[in-house]
From Swiss-Prot:
It holds the Pfam family TRAM. Residues 198-256 form the TRAM domain. One of its GO terms (cellular component) is cytoplasm. It catalyses: uridine(2552) in 23S rRNA + S-adenosyl-L-methionine = 2'-O-methyluridine(2552) in 23S rRNA + S-adenosyl-L-homocysteine + H(+). It is an enzyme of class 2 (transferase). The active site is at K151 (proton acceptor). This is Ribosomal RNA large subunit methyltransferase E. S-adenosyl-L-methionine binds at G48, W50, D68, D86, D111. It comes from Haloquadratum walsbyi (strain DSM 16790 / HBSQ001). It is found in: Cytoplasm. Keywords: Cytoplasm, Methyltransferase, rRNA processing, S-adenosyl-L-methionine, Transferase. Its EC number is 2.1.1.166. It comes from the Archaea.
């Protein structure tokens, strides 16, 4: 039995709409994306296999919203909702924001793939274009700490796209699930812990130490964002260089 037949048959037997449902399960097992009560947005969600997996993962206290220009047949889950529209249209984004109802989004998913031409370079470029569209939506609606999963085909434009994702998240990992077909060049980039800091690594700025943390490092506040700086005292006015950023805090060093 081929891998394709195995996952296809399992999906039929276990009630999943697509064999790709197992890809998301395997990605979550590797990267630890979902948690109970999470709010999840699935872009290009038709026919709904990933919606099913996400709903199971977040449980009855969670919310899962699928967006697609195709109609998504209703699922037997009270926590799943769908929006029919183009995810790049502002009207669709507004409908999504309204449906989320000001709750924090925890995860944005995209398993979108282009219509295949058979020309590898063309198919790769189109897949990166779709991935960038999903990335744009994710950076628009994900708060600090949120996660992003996106499918993309391997090729020359992948490194630049991955670098762009890396600037918005604490780290990025590439996953190729066992459920992917052997003939496919697909992989999934997982951006973990969205960063929304008002500064970037390498930035230099003048600031005042407003407090001392539990580990003895000074605390600087930049538009509400915390930077830890070693070797300073409370009240010091210093010039610092940002060295590293996390979703909620960053680190800097004094410039001598």
């Amino acid at each position: 039995m081929t891998g394709r037949d195995e996952y296809y048959n399992r999906a039929k037997q276990e009630g999943y709409r697509t064999r790709s449902a197992y890809k998301l399960q395997q990605i979550d097992a590797d990267a630890g994306v979902f948690g109970p009560g999470n709010t999840v947005i699935d872009l290009g969600a038709a026919p709904g296999g990933w919606l099913q997996v996400a709903a199971e993962a977040v449980g009855p206290s969670g919310t899962v919203i699928g967006v697609d220009f195709q109609r998504i047949r209703d699922l037997e889950s009270d926590i799943v909702d769908t929006i029919r529209g183009d995810m790049t249209d502002e009207s669709t984004k507004n409908a999504l924001r309204k449906r989320v109802n000001n709750s924090s989004v925890n995860v944005v998913l995209s398993d979108m793939a282009p219509n295949m031409t058979g020309e590898y370079s063309v198919d790769h470029a189109r897949s990166v274009h779709l991935a960038r569209q999903a990335f744009s939506v994710a950076t628009d609606i994900l708060p600090a700490g949120g996660d992003f999963i996106v499918k993309v085909f391997d090729g020359r434009d992948l490194a630049d796209f991955r670098q762009d994702v890396d600037t918005e998240f604490e780290y990025v990992k590439s996953i190729r699930p066992d459920a992917s077909r052997d003939s496919s060049s697909e992989q999934y980039l997982v951006g973990k812990h969205r960063i929304t800091a008002p500064v970037s690594p390498g930035d230099e700025l003048d600031a005042t130490v407003v407090d001392i943390g539990s580990e003895g490092d000074g605390i600087i506040k930049i538009d509400g964002y915390t930077l830890f700086v070693p070797g300073v005292e409370n009240g010091d006015s210093v010039r610092v260089r940002v060295t590293d950023l996390k979703s909620n805090v960053g680190f800097a060093e004094v410039i001598e």
